[in-house]
UniProtKB/Swiss-Prot annotation:
InterPro entries: Aminoacid_DH-like_N_sf, NAD(P)-bd_dom_sf, THF_DH/CycHdrlase, THF_DH/CycHdrlase_cat_dom, THF_DH/CycHdrlase_CS, THF_DH/CycHdrlase_NAD-bd_dom. Catalyzes the oxidation of 5,10-methylenetetrahydrofolate to 5,10-methenyltetrahydrofolate and then the hydrolysis of 5,10-methenyltetrahydrofolate to 10-formyltetrahydrofolate. This is Bifunctional protein FolD. Keywords: Amino-acid biosynthesis, Histidine biosynthesis, Hydrolase, Methionine biosynthesis, Multifunctional enzyme, NADP, One-carbon metabolism, Oxidoreductase, Purine biosynthesis. Transmembrane segments: none annotated. One of its GO terms (molecular function) is methenyltetrahydrofolate cyclohydrolase activity. Homodimer. It catalyses: (6R)-5,10-methylene-5,6,7,8-tetrahydrofolate + NADP(+) = (6R)-5,10-methenyltetrahydrofolate + NADPH; (6R)-5,10-methenyltetrahydrofolate + H2O = (6R)-10-formyltetrahydrofolate + H(+). Belongs to the tetrahydrofolate dehydrogenase/cyclohydrolase family. One of its GO terms (biological process) is purine nucleotide biosynthetic process. It comes from Streptococcus equi subsp. zooepidemicus (strain MGCS10565).
Length: 284
């Protein structure tokens, strides 16, 4: 029988432990980890994500700020705001919610964030640390998946891991983290031929493509561990993943649900990296 990887329960456990660490840091050093989230425009999905992040940060005892800007804000104004938070010693983590309006260049905004406060792990300096095997700030979704592997005792060394989707946010950093644990990694994408056959070789299958129920049982070998990063809406507005959960569960040994799988862990790792940034600030 398939085992459900309960990301929501793990996230709650980790956030409770994190709240205690935050309380100790405040009592011993007088430091409260500070996180600012900048939201540009009124994208409904982004608004939900930002509210969830704000709620989790406050529950864990963080100083939490949310800045909401009109989608007409110019790139220079946004960079100027980021620079203000770069210089603010009470803020240890800066997150600019993506996607941004078309007139704002994502890369320029990411470059503007102090790498020490880049809790999303997207700054080239942090990706460089990741590729060189010395990760500091790591993109939160792959970091959360690695925590799930650890908590559930999922062996990675020597395993065939297939990642569907090569984004800078999930696919590429996920591949590097798995390589660091001595997995054999195949990174697939929209031009990959015979995708189903490749996926069927996977001991561990991680899917992040943004296409609802794209992965059916035809893509999965019996006993595989399946990690579903997708968040999509079906015709009835119901939240679904990239994996056809019911039919894939018949073959998989372990699987993450949507919702309640990877999503809560992404927020947890955002908070954990903000806390670690605050600790590094104290030790300077």
């Amino acid at each position: 029988m398939v085992q459900i990887i309960d990301g929501k329960a793990l996230a709650q456990k980790m956030q409770a432990a994190l709240a205690k660490k935050v309380e100790s840091l405040k009592a011993e050093k007088g430091i409260v980890p500070g996180l600012v989230v900048i939201l540009v425009g009124d994208n409904p999905a982004s608004q939900v994500y930002v509210r969830n992040k704000e709620r989790a940060a406050l529950a864990a005892g963080f100083k939490s700020e949310t800045v909401r800007l009109s989608d007409s804000v110019c790139q220079e104004e946004l960079i100027e705001l980021i620079e203000q938070y770069n210089q603010d010693d009470t803020i240890h983590g800066i997150l600019v919610q993506l996607p941004l309006p078309h007139h704002i260049n994502d890369k320029s905004i990411i470059l503007a964030i102090d790498p020490k406060k880049d809790v999303d792990g997207f700054h080239p300096m942090n990706t460089g640390h990741l590729w060189s095997g010395r990760p500091n700030m790591v993109p939160c979704t792959p970091a959360g998946i690695m925590e799930m592997f650890r908590d559930y005792g999922i062996e990675l060394e020597g395993k065939n891991a297939v990642i569907v989707g090569r984004s800078n946010i999930v696919g590429k950093p996920m591949a590097q983290l798995l390589l660091d644990k001595n997995a054999t990694v195949t990174l697939t994408h929209s031009r990959t031929r015979q995708l189903a056959a490749i996926c069927r070789r996977a001991d561990i299958l991680i899917v992040a493509i943004g296409q609802g129920h794209f992965i059916t049982k035809d893509f999965v070998k019996e006993g595989a561990v399946v990690i579903d990063v997708g968040m999509n809406r079906d015709v009835n507005g119901r939240l679904i993943g990239d994996v056809a959960f019911d039919e894939v569960s018949e073959l998989a040994s372990m699987i993450t649900p949507v919702p309640g799988g990877v999503g809560p862990m992404t927020i947890t790792m955002l908070l954990e990296q903000t806390y670690q940034a605050a600790l590094r600030r104290v030790s300077q």
